[in-house]
Amino acid sequence: MGSGYAMKNLTIQNVSKTYFDPYAGANVTAVHDISLKVNQGEFISIVGPSGCGKTTLLNMIAGFLPISGGSINIDDKPIKGPGADRGVVFQTFALFPWKTVGENVGFGPRMRGLPKKECDQIALEFLSLVGLEHVAQKYPNELSGGMQQRVGVVRALANNPDVLLMDEPFASVDAQTRMTLQEELTKIWQERRPTILFITHDVAESVFLADRVVVLSKGRVLEDMPIQLQRPRVWENLIEDDTFKALSSQVLNKVRSA
């Protein structure tokens, strides 16, 4: 199965976000003059302490929040609101409870006007990436939390977005399931090569997944660190790996200094 993603780059240039805080009675800057270029097919983790601007930045890229200054472009096209060129996976299981699993995954292609039969085939293709093609006719409430989040990931991918935005998608599952989901995501990424921005509080998760780890502090980029680890990555091989531990320690020290 080859990649279905066009060669497009995400460029964040001098982006700021300011809002009025009624409790403080003044404007507050959540994101300050951030510049970041993400090449097509890169996997970028964004990590930092609570309140550093991670989710605010993701919401501006998604088009959910307007920017206060700067620009965010996919190639030369400015982002002015939500669009099918960006897929979003949230921490909560944001599936339609009245639709089957297959209908959830095929929803994006269906909204693009593709025939139902083709959408059903697309849904099965993407569900097979996470071994869930057998639950296509079930409803979300019949699945475990980990299975629901797998469906959420492939539902976002099935619409072939230029950029996949993931906001702490594995935070609400248990540790063992989280590690399995992380390994599955890296396998999907290697096979499909979508561009991914992954928000997390978890330093080890950020290093395990990414090509680059971006550390945010007080709304600014504190560090943009390349991760030189071979792929494919599995926890069994990396958990005691000296390079992995050294990189995780470097990122953790940056986060603690933020």
Segments from the language model and where they lie:
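Catalytic Walker B motif of ABC-type/P-loop ATPase nucleotide-binding domains
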Residues: 164-167
